[in-house]
Regions:
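Extended ligand-binding groove/face enriched in aromatic
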Residues: 15-106
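Alpha-helical bundle segments that constitute or directly flank the non-heme di-iron/ferroxidase center
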Residues: 6
Length: 166
């Protein structure tokens, strides 16, 4: 919503996006999964993307410190899910984006080394991913959006995000 509000100069949408952003942070709890799609890495990724695009001003190391600490509670050597949506590759997508914005001070070097070892041990591709690589493209043409799913994954919002990020 922030990207949409910025692209179209919609202040009402920007205020609504801010309210939703705060609700996400209020909803963070200790037993959340670490994944990109429904977990802590996704919250971190979204926050980092907003900061990178200049839509929120913050120190990522300050605002994401608690989230990063909760992620580090999971031993990277014991992670078995290597997927983008809920596993190691999604965590790497988040960290790669973070490092592209500012030096990541909230993850300790040992954790990062153990995570890299997990990536190497499982022969995960080293190429950087883009969020669009993770999402499913809708099965309907962009012009036929009426009465279609609204979501970002396989829905109408996919086309909006794609046009904004290009």
């Amino acid at each position: 919503l922030y990207l949409y509000a910025d692209a179209y100069g919609d202040e009402v949408m920007r205020e609504y996006a801010w309210e939703l952003f705060q609700q996400v942070y209020d909803g963070v709890h200790t037993d959340m999964p670490v994944g990109l799609e429904r977990g802590l890495a996704g919250i971190g990724y979204g926050t980092t993307l907003l900061c990178k695009r200049g839509l929120v001003e913050c120190s990522l190391n300050d605002i994401l410190e608690d989230i990063d600490r909760k992620i580090m509670e999971r031993d990277p050597r014991r992670l078995t899910d290597m997927s983008v949506r809920s596993g190691v590759r999604g965590l790497m997508l988040y960290l790669d984006l973070r490092q592209s914005v500012e030096a990541v001070a909230t993850f300790d070097s040992r954790y990062m080394m153990e995570l890299q070892d997990t990536v190497a041990r499982n022969n995960l591709p080293c190429r950087a991913l883009d969020v669009m690589d993770v999402l499913n493209e809708p099965t309907f043409p962009e012009t036929e959006y009426i009465e279609r799913p609204l979501g970002i994954d396989g829905g109408c919002a996919y086309y909006i995000l794609k046009s904004i990020l290009v």
